[in-house]
Amino acid sequence: EITTRLVGSEMCIRDRAMPYIRKFSGETIVVKYGGNAMINDKLKSAVMSDIALMRLVGVNVVLVHGGGPEINAMLKAVGKESKFENGMRVTDDETIDIVQMVLAGKVNKNLVQLMEKHGGKAIGLCGLDGNMLMAEKLVTSADLGYVGEIKEVNPEPLQNVINNGYIPIVATVASGYDGNVYLSLIHISEPTRRVVIS
C-alpha cells in the first residue's frame, strides 16, 4: 500500500510537470543565483539538484552567480572592511582582485563540483572568458570603483558549452570596454526567460 501511494504520488508530480517540460524543453533559461541563497548548504544542494534535473529533461540552463558573503569573508580574512553605498559594494583596486579570486575561483568551482555531485555536467566560466560579459563603469552619486553594468553579452562561449551537453556556471566578473575588470550588476531582461534565486 505504501509503495502504491509513493508510485501514485510520483506519477501525480510527473503529470503536473509534463506541460512545463514540454513547454520549456529546448529553451534556454538563465538562473540568477545570489550569494545570500548559497549560505544554507541544504538549499544550495536542492538548487543544484533541480538545475541538473532541468537539464536532464531538455531545458538548457545558464547559472549566473554572485557570492557576496564569500567576498565579505575573504575581505575580513585579509583585514579589509567591506564597504557599501546604497546596497552596492564599493570596489577599489584591492577589492576587485579579491572579488575576481573569490567569484571566478572558489565560489564558481565549488558550484561546478556540487553540480557534478548531483548528476549535472557543468563548466565554470566568468564574464572575462571570451569577453562574454562586457561592462561599463556604473556611474552613481558615489564612486563605487570597479562596479560595472553589463552592456553586451557574447553568447558564443555559452552556446558552445550548452551544445556540448554542459551547464555553464558563470561568475559575475566582466570585461570593461576600458580594459578594466568589473564586478558586474546582472539585470536579466526579456526575451531571456529567467529564474531569480536571491
Segments predicted by a language model, with ranges:
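Short, active-site-adjacent cap segments at secondary-structure transitions
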Residues: 37-39, 69-72, 130-134, 176, ...
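Active-site loops and adjacent core secondary-structure elements that bind or stabilize anionic groups
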Residues: 11-12
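Catalytic-site beta-strand/loop segments enriched in glycine and acidic/polar residues
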Residues: 32, 161-185
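Metabolite-binding pocket within alpha/beta catalytic cores that recognizes anionic/polar moieties
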Residues: 23-118
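Single conserved hydrophobic/aromatic residue that forms the stacking wall/gate
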Residues: 1-8, 186-197
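Charged helix-capping and loop-helix junction motifs
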Residues: 44-49, 183-189
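Ligand-binding beta-strand-loop-alpha-helix segment within the catalytic cores
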Residues: 76-167
